[in-house]
Amino acid sequence: QFISKPDLDPFALTKFHGHNAIHYCLGLEAKERGMTFMHQAGEDAELMTWAKEAFVDEVVVGLRNEFNNFKDDIFTEDGFTAYAEDALERMVNPYLRDPIDRVTRDPIRKLGWDDRVVGSIRFAMNAGINPEKMISSARKGLNEIMIAQSFQNRTDALNLVWQEIPSFQELESVRELILNTNQDCEKV
C-alpha cells in the first residue's frame, strides 16, 4: 500500500542523519575491531549495543528535537526506536556481505558540515545532549584522513574537511567539541 506524504524532507533527513550516519559510525567501530564485513558487527553483542545506544540516545534525540512538530508515527519515541532497531538489523544483514571498506570510504565527504555524522552531532547538540559516541566516530574518521593525507593532527584533517565553510559560532562550537576530548557539548 502506498501512503502519500505531503513533506518528504523529514523522512529523507531521518534516513541520512539516522541510518546513514550510524551505518558509517558502526563501520568505523567494526573496522577498529579488525572486522572486514558489516555482518561481523552483528555477531558482536557489545558493538551492537554501542550502535543502538548511539542511534537511540544520540541521533534519535536530535532528530526528535529537530522534527518535534512533524506529525507521523515514525517521529515518536517508539517509532524512532523501532526504526533504529530495524535499520541496525538491515545494516548487518549477512546476505549483503557489505564490506566495511565500502561503508567507511570517503571520510572527507561523510564528515562534511551538512553531511551525515556532523549533521547528527549538530542535531544532538541542539537537543542539549553530548553525542559522545558520534563524536568518537567522527574522531576515528578524522584519524583516517590524517593517515591518508599524512597530517600530524586532527585539526589539519578537520580544516581540510571544512575548508569551504565560513566560520561562525555553531561551527566553532562543533569544531571544539570534536577536537577537544574533555569538553561537554552545549546547546547551540
Give the ranges of each region predicted by the language model.
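Substrate/ligand-engaging "lid" and interaction regions
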Residues: 1-188
